[in-house]
């Protein structure tokens, strides 16, 4: 770790920086949470295949899990950061605990409790939610420790999204091209293999990330953010809504995006699009390589833009792009012959281009949001002197999760209108006109509405690139004062 100014390492600056390899390894942390989340987006198939639960009941448990998640987020944000170790810092122990809980939930729901009914299924699901919440708290603490340099922060979003996309691509190929032919469908046995793969891959990624944090996640670097006698409280959430306009903007954008993505990213929607409308479920794996390449190119571009104009402006610009691409995709399905996708060259080419751009646009906006969260936490430290990145992000995501809790119920209700009440969509099901419109609403309509809400909210986002320079300058002085006060308090306590 170093504290240097841009390219002049001998000049003291306002920024904490780190080495590139540390960013590359640390950025695997968000991918760990996303990999576990991908497993649980197939909850309808897990519930039906392993426990015999109806789709609507599985959706109810998932929605209850979102509410449970919303409640535990701020509680963990207040309690978890108090777990500080003089040997291992704060972030790494929290990451380890979160991983172990998520791994236990996957192994339990896949191998220990199948056939035992709704209670163990729900317990495992809630254990996953709690583990992910704790893991996220470790991520939030680490993100503000490893670097606050505006030239480096976008790199975390860049690397995180690339890891997430590559994992999604590999999983899509693994599921569609290797496991699907072996098991003959989306069977419970197929899901068990994916679950084990997730547990092992995430263990490796978390260990690499913890190794990257060993220089910055120290007792001294953590304590520099806390002033003796200043406590983080749940009531601070209300204060942030009152005085932090960047925080309010983040809440609105996150809530609208989460509700839309909760519906659009459900595994049943992918089955409806590729397995029912297009009629070639394996095609989703075939095109994943193109979507990943396009996304990587755009992410490199947007994170470069974010360094120059700030994360907020970059997010707004690419949310407009994502909305336009989603509208274009809808018009293509409405007026084109989507049944010829993967059959004829022209419709296939148009779909691959639009689908790649749509996936890339979603990934680039997510990359910008990662940096925005860090900036909002630093802005709160600037305004109040309270270092609470976990509570800032937890409150934003909590309110988003309360709204998105309706996503599972919306999905179940929409599926019920096309006959999927006690079962789930399977490749080869009839593609009726009603199925088409419900699929378009779940896949594209919800995303468009969510992005429009975000575009409106972002007009009140105050954190420009210039403003963040001012924020970090003030925060550097405050950290120095805090560390001096902490050492004085420890010396006074030792003298008694």
Segments (PLM) and residue ranges:
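Membrane-embedded alpha-helical bundles of multi-pass transporters/translocases
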Residues: 2-487, 496
